[in-house]
Amino acid sequence: MSSIYMNILLAFTMALLGLLMYRSHLMSSLLCLEGMMLSLFILSTVTMLNTSFTLSSMMPVMLMVFAACEAAVGLALLVTVSNTYGLDYVQNLNLLQC
């Protein structure tokens, strides 16, 4: 495995560990998710360029569309929770507490 792939996989792993360790605040969880999506985008782009497979050229674009949708929904949820509760804790998202 080349060093480029190792660095990208290391970035994905660090973002995943950050998501698992710092999951008390919604904003830190969203940042870790964005880091994971960015590393997946770079990995798919590098893989597409190395294989020269023309049908896979839409995969990075579709991944960025899903990442933008995820960011928009996450930020809308963050604004709603912070306006309702005044905090951005993930534990406030539990619907069973209502």
Swiss-Prot record:
Task: Supply the InterPro entries for this chain.
Answer: NADH_UbQ_OxRdtase_chain4L/K, NUOK/Mnh_C1-like
Q: Which domain of life is it from?
A: Eukaryota
Molecular function in Gene Ontology: NADH dehydrogenase (ubiquinone) activity
Say which enzyme class the record assigns: translocase
Q: Where are the transmembrane segments?
A: 1-21, 29-49, 61-81
The subcellular localization recorded is:
Mitochondrion inner membrane
Give the record's GO biological process terms. Answer: ATP synthesis coupled electron transport
GO (cellular component) term, any one = respiratory chain complex I
Which UniProt keywords are present, listed alphabetically?
Answer: Electron transport, Membrane, Mitochondrion, Mitochondrion inner membrane, NAD, Respiratory chain, Translocase, Transmembrane, Transmembrane helix, Transport, Ubiquinone
Protein topology in the membrane: Multi-pass membrane protein
What reaction does this enzyme carry out catalytically? a ubiquinone + NADH + 5 H(+)(in) = a ubiquinol + NAD(+) + 4 H(+)(out)
* Translocase among keywords: yes
Q: What EC number is given for this enzyme?
A: 7.1.1.2
**Stated role:** Core subunit of the mitochondrial membrane respiratory chain NADH dehydrogenase (Complex I) which catalyzes electron transfer from NADH through the respiratory chain, using ubiquinone as an electron acceptor. Part of the enzyme membrane arm which is embedded in the lipid bilayer and involved in proton translocation.
Q: How does it assemble?
A: Core subunit of respiratory chain NADH dehydrogenase (Complex I) which is composed of 45 different subunits.
| Protein family membership | Belongs to the complex I subunit 4L family.
Q: What is this protein called?
A: NADH-ubiquinone oxidoreductase chain 4L
Q: Which organism is it from?
A: Tamandua tetradactyla (Southern anteater)
